[in-house]
Design a protein with these regions (language model features):
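Periplasmic-binding protein-like
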Residues: 31-58, 108, 183-191, 272, ...
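C-terminal motif of bacterial Sec signal peptides marking the signal peptidase cleavage site
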Residues: 20-24
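Bilobed "Venus flytrap"/periplasmic-binding protein-like clamshell domains
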Residues: 104, 108-111, 121-134, 184-253, ...
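Bacterial N-terminal signal peptides that target proteins for export
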Residues: 1-12
Length: 285
């Protein structure tokens, strides 16, 4: 969480914020700054989702993940997005242009794992699946859909692989088989810079005690159908009891962030890496 983000992703998220006319112009009286509550609230594993009837592809994906972990490729890709490296764009082939294609479904609203600049995809997941397609000798096709339909697209046979910063859990395992994990994540809160509610918190239990003290007048935003939603609203399949706050879903964490700047919600909850990107983009870092 302490590593600097790359300028390309920061600029891309800043463009998203400007596009909705809200960067550095919040009307909440707190100025234009936000902060990360730097306490991990969950422990999660990211993995790729594969169709349940495609054991051959699952085996190939797991072999590829083991290979990129062992030979340093995964570390090199992570360095591009969490360190000083330069992200490499990935361009989707036209679906159906050939018979030898790997069709990957994603939701390109989750930097630094998947995002778009024009027609080019960037992100940890996108570079990984490009490497996988090359390894398999296939053309890469990327389908960009709403997050809540990513795994269902694989389940229905519209795509071979789901790559969207997917947290492994039993609910999603009903739709797809998960590969071995390639990234460990957790949920973090974003607050306005002058918010003091969590200033004395040292542990996840401390943060949860504060969250439990809030009532429905406190609104917390999240990207819809992500772990953040289930953490806030509660979900037995995810093992979360939830809180008595009002949850509000968005198409992306960036949109939740700008709505917080506008004073419409109190906090945002999202995975660690996107949280840092959003905070740094809003704060102009």
């Amino acid at each position: 969480m302490k590593k600097k983000i790359t300028s390309l992703v920061s600029i891309t998220l800043a463009i998203i914020l400007v596009a909705v006319g809200l960067t550095a112009c919040g009307s909440n009286g707190s100025g234009d700054k936000v902060k990360l509550i730097d306490i991990a609230l969950t422990d999660e594993l990211y993995a790729f989702g594969v169709a349940k009837n495609d054991a051959e592809l699952l085996e190939a994906v797991n072999a590829y993940i083991a290979e990129v972990k062992a030979d340093g490729t995964l570390d090199a890709i992570n360095e591009k997005y969490f360190g000083s490296g330069t992200p490499e764009g990935v361009v989707s082939a036209e679906q159906g242009a050939s018979e030898n294609q790997l069709i990957v479904v994603t939701n390109a609203e989750f930097a630094p794992f998947e995002y778009k600049k024009g027609d080019t995809y960037y992100g940890v997941d996108m570079e990984l699946v490009k490497g996988l397609a090359d390894k398999l000798g296939k053309e890469l096709v990327i389908l960009n859909v709403d997050f809540d339909s990513v795994t269902s697209n694989v389940e229905a046979g519209y795509a071979d692989l789901a790559a969207a910063g997917l947290t492994v859990n039993e609910k999603r395992q009903k739709q797809v088989n998960f590969s071995d994990s390639y990234y460990t994540a957790s949920q973090y809160l974003i607050a306005l810079e002058d918010d003091t509610a969590f200033d004395n918190c040292k542990t996840a239990a401390d943060v949860e005690a504060v969250l439990s003290s809030f009532d429905s007048s406190t609104q917390i935003g999240y990207q819809s159908e992500t772990t953040g939603q289930y953490y806030i609203t509660g979900d037995a399949d995810w093992g979360f009891d939830g809180f008595g706050v009002t949850g509000k879903g968005y198409d992306s964490g960036a949109l939740a962030g700008v709505d917080m700047l506008n004073g419409n919600i109190s906090y945002v909850i999202i995975d660690a890496a996107p949280a840092e990107f959003i905070v740094n983009s809003i704060n102009g870092k």
